[in-house]
Amino acid sequence: MNKQVRQSKIREMLHLHEVGNQHDLIRLLEEAGIRVAQATLSRDCSELGIIRSKGLNGYRLALPEENPGNIIKGLVEVEVLSIQSNEAVIIIKTLPGRAHGVGSFLDQLKNSQILGTIAGDDTVLVIPVSVAQISQVISYIQENLSKN
């Protein structure tokens, strides 16, 4: 199946159903006649920017445009435990399993001072464009994690 058609169907499923996890999404896609491997679905979800969001009946998968920025900021703030740096990089410690979401959130901000992020299970490595601007990048990250 064509990637664009599959991703369009994924968007449609997320708009029509409260999907709790990727396993449920695979089941819905199969019911619609679309067979997809879990690894392929995971890549599609990443490319589409799909995140876990608090819904009426618990957490669900959601497209980024369904979530106002302040809600995402609030969720990310709860997941961040600490922000530290040395003279070269910034390290963000998160709750277990939440580093990818925090890293993706920072990537979506597209700040020109951030060269890139690398996320593990509970740690995000933030690489600034210039080490001379680490304090400004930390301030920017803190501002964008605040609920205000």
UniProtKB/Swiss-Prot annotation:
Keywords assigned by UniProt, alphabetized: Amino-acid biosynthesis, Arginine biosynthesis, Cytoplasm, DNA-binding, Repressor, Transcription, Transcription regulation
Gene Ontology BP annotations: L-arginine biosynthetic process; protein complex oligomerization; regulation of arginine biosynthetic process
Cellular component per GO, a single term: cytoplasm
InterPro entries (alphabetical): Arg_repress, Arg_repress_C, Arg_repress_C_sf, Arg_repress_DNA-bd, WH-like_DNA-bd_sf, WH_DNA-bd_sf
The keyword Repressor appears for this protein: yes
Membership in a protein family: Belongs to the ArgR family.
HAMAP family listed in its UniProt record: Arg_repressor (MF_00173)
Name of the protein in question: Arginine repressor
Gene name of the encoded protein: argR
